[in-house]
A protein has these predicted regions:
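Bacterial N-terminal signal peptides
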Residues: 1-12
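Short, low-complexity, Pro/Ser/Thr/Gly-rich segments in the mature regions of secreted, periplasmic
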Residues: 112-121
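Residue-level signal for tight coil/turn positions that link beta-strands
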Residues: 81-82, 101-102
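Surface-exposed, flexible coil segments in extracellular/virion-facing regions
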Residues: 83-90
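N-terminal glycine/threonine-rich, aromatic-flanked beta-hairpin/loop signature
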Residues: 33-78, 93-96, 104-113
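N-terminal helix-cap/turn-to-beta initiation motif at the start of protein domains
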Residues: 16-30, 69-72
């Protein structure tokens, strides 16, 4: 019984340590967002300059493109332990993309499709 509990706690600790909060400067740069492998791609720039009213960082690029999936155009973004949140002007989260790997963030849509945010390659 004691060994089972030790294994459980050990697993919980390793899972928690995999949630690393990256800084805005780590994530700043050019990114693309697209649904599945569709040809339409939104080109975004995650900037590390703060947007105080949104409690996040400046989001640049073609943010209007995101309104095909979001109820309003995002103004900012913020890193989270689980991934990247896209924010409206007042700071509410419009979308949370979960980290899948280095430079790869995803969210499952209600219709079964998937939105993929990837760091753009130079």
């Amino acid at each position: 019984m004691v060994c089972l509990l030790c294994g459980f706690f050990s697993t919980g600790i390793s899972m928690a340590s995999s949630l690393i909060l990256l800084s805005a400067s780590d994530l700043a740069g050019q990114w693309t967002l697209q649904q599945d492998e569709a040809p339409a791609i939104c080109h975004l720039e995650l900037r590390d300059s703060e947007v105080a009213e949104a409690s996040g960082y400046d989001l640049g690029g073609d943010t209007a493109c995101l309104t095909r999936w979001l109820p309003s155009e995002p103004r900012a973004w913020r890193p989270t332990p689980a991934g990247i949140a896209l924010l409206e002007r007042g700071g509410l989260t419009l979308m949370l993309l979960g980290r899948q790997g280095e430079g790869d963030y995803r969210v499952q849509k209600g219709d079964g499709g998937q939105l993929v945010l990837r760091r753009a390659t130079p």
